[in-house]
Amino acid sequence: MQDQKGKIISVIGPVVDVKFPEGQLPNVYDALKVKNEYSGEELILEVEQLIGDDTARCVAMDSTDGIRRGQEVINTLEPIKVPVGDTTLGRMVNLLGKPIDEKGDVEGEEYWPIHRDPPSLNEQDTSIEILETGIKCIDLLAPFPRGGKIGFFGGAGVGKTVLVMELIRNIAKEHQGISVFAGVGERTREGNDLWLEMQETGVIDSTALVFGQMNEPPGARFRVPLTALTISEYFRDRQKKDVLLFIDNIFRFVQAGSEVSALLGRMPSAVGYQPTLASDMGQLQERITSTKDGSITSVQAIYVPADDFTDPAPATTFAHLDANINLSRRQSELGLYPAVDPLDSTSKMLDPNVVGQDHYSVAREVKEVLQRYEDLQDIIAILGIEELSEEDRQIVNRARRIQRFLTQPFFVAERFTNYSGKYVNVEDTIKGFKEILEGKHDDLPESAFYMVGTIEEAVEKAKKMNE
């Protein structure tokens, strides 16, 4: 078939208008190719809008430096396609599936388009199942649904990346699962650190990484999550595996969409975001789901601009999440890692019909004790703990033990902490907290509960301390 060719008629930043002969207009989301005479590379444009009878308005997936009016553009007659399959594991690619790890081309078992329909309702799995992470504070207070969506909120330096890496390690080692990491609009240095740390900790072999960092044009940042999701869908649908999809940071995905929105001629909506914000987010999130064959469970880091949770970007994301994990600076300053805020983190799965009455009751009681401790902080600071009633003093003592027992040594942080990593089953987690709440370990020193796995380890640690 003869190539369908057009000519560039305007270039405004990342947005390029291409004129085609009559009857040869491409479809929306078709990929167009143009030779960048400046770099000698081939530039991919994605059709976003059709204007009039003969013009396609496109977004460039790389820098448009060196592109000029009158240049010839070839229509590939299909959307952007990326390599999928086992060959992507242990590799780092960009949104087009091109390697950025200097290890040679990625030859896919198949090539799938990045724009795909979500599974039909008939294919989706409606059963509710908990994904055990082996991390006590998450499994107890904000359990993850298999095939659900989890949001991590936290500022810089509170341990988001370490928590992400521990989850990748636990899924790979304990569940024989596969992880896909999408780096969207974050710092290149952080991406490099993650890549090097993954190689050192040995989780790289069961992970595919897709990056479009801060230095990339908005078109690339806007499509990186779709590439990572397409790679995940292959493992779910063809290999029938459970996949963990990490997106860091989902806010940058929205930000990239708003950057090109005005150039595409759309009227901005609230706070200058794109008018298609909800549908852009929906198209991505609806594809993250469980089918009868496998599941995609997604963990999304979410930057909250100016700590304003009513901002349209985080507010739109909230609607899709099943669990919110809040990483608190106060916890990390106290040395309580993982720095998950037990009172601010929630999950729709913490329901007696899902996790069972025992788990639910222990989790509620843990939160009640910690909340009471929080309420008593002012009195303790002003008058001292001696002024509290006997009952309140007991609550404070148990709350401090619970706080420390919520900490846990991570496998991926072994070389920094000198504590050997621990994976704790949900049953052991519930048993441990239940015994603390019942007062069985009121006689043990607080420090015995810090950085241990099960309650038996805390008892053992206390014995060693007394020797």
UniProtKB/Swiss-Prot annotation:
<keyword id="KW-0813">Transport</keyword>
<dbReference type="Pfam" id="PF22919">
    <property type="entry name" value="ATP-synt_VA_C"/>
</dbReference>
<dbReference type="InterPro" id="IPR003593">
    <property type="entry name" value="AAA+_ATPase"/>
</dbReference>
<dbReference type="GO" id="GO:0046933">
    <property type="term" value="F:proton-transporting ATP synthase activity, rotational mechanism"/>
</dbReference>
<keyword id="KW-0066">ATP synthesis</keyword>
<dbReference type="InterPro" id="IPR027417">
    <property type="entry name" value="P-loop_NTPase"/>
</dbReference>
<dbReference type="InterPro" id="IPR024034">
    <property type="entry name" value="ATPase_F1/V1_b/a_C"/>
</dbReference>
<dbReference type="InterPro" id="IPR036121">
    <property type="entry name" value="ATPase_F1/V1/A1_a/bsu_N_sf"/>
</dbReference>
<dbReference type="InterPro" id="IPR000194">
    <property type="entry name" value="ATPase_F1/V1/A1_a/bsu_nucl-bd"/>
</dbReference>
<keyword id="KW-0997">Cell inner membrane</keyword>
<keyword id="KW-0375">Hydrogen ion transport</keyword>
<comment type="function">
    <text>Produces ATP from ADP in the presence of a proton gradient across the membrane. The catalytic sites are hosted primarily by the beta subunits.</text>
</comment>
<dbReference type="GO" id="GO:0005524">
    <property type="term" value="F:ATP binding"/>
</dbReference>
<dbReference type="GO" id="GO:0045259">
    <property type="term" value="C:proton-transporting ATP synthase complex"/>
</dbReference>
<keyword id="KW-0472">Membrane</keyword>
<keyword id="KW-1003">Cell membrane</keyword>
<dbReference type="GO" id="GO:0005886">
    <property type="term" value="C:plasma membrane"/>
</dbReference>
<dbReference type="InterPro" id="IPR055190">
    <property type="entry name" value="ATP-synt_VA_C"/>
</dbReference>
<dbReference type="GO" id="GO:0016887">
    <property type="term" value="F:ATP hydrolysis activity"/>
</dbReference>
<dbReference type="Pfam" id="PF02874">
    <property type="entry name" value="ATP-synt_ab_N"/>
</dbReference>
<keyword id="KW-0067">ATP-binding</keyword>
<dbReference type="Pfam" id="PF00006">
    <property type="entry name" value="ATP-synt_ab"/>
</dbReference>
<dbReference type="InterPro" id="IPR005722">
    <property type="entry name" value="ATP_synth_F1_bsu"/>
</dbReference>
<feature type="binding site">
    <location>
        <begin position="154"/>
        <end position="161"/>
    </location>
    <ligand>
        <name>ATP</name>
    </ligand>
</feature>
<dbReference type="InterPro" id="IPR020003">
    <property type="entry name" value="ATPase_a/bsu_AS"/>
</dbReference>
<keyword id="KW-0139">CF(1)</keyword>
<keyword id="KW-0406">Ion transport</keyword>
<comment type="similarity">
    <text>Belongs to the ATPase alpha/beta chains family.</text>
</comment>
<dbReference type="InterPro" id="IPR004100">
    <property type="entry name" value="ATPase_F1/V1/A1_a/bsu_N"/>
</dbReference>
<keyword id="KW-0547">Nucleotide-binding</keyword>
<keyword id="KW-1278">Translocase</keyword>
<protein>
    <recommendedName>
        <fullName>ATP synthase subunit beta</fullName>
        <ecNumber>7.1.2.2</ecNumber>
    </recommendedName>
</protein>
<comment type="subunit">
    <text>F-type ATPases have 2 components, CF(1) - the catalytic core - and CF(0) - the membrane proton channel. CF(1) has five subunits: alpha(3), beta(3), gamma(1), delta(1), epsilon(1). CF(0) has three main subunits: a(1), b(2) and c(9-12). The alpha and beta chains form an alternating ring which encloses part of the gamma chain. CF(1) is attached to CF(0) by a central stalk formed by the gamma and epsilon chains, while a peripheral stalk is formed by the delta and b chains.</text>
</comment>
<dbReference type="InterPro" id="IPR050053">
    <property type="entry name" value="ATPase_alpha/beta_chains"/>
</dbReference>
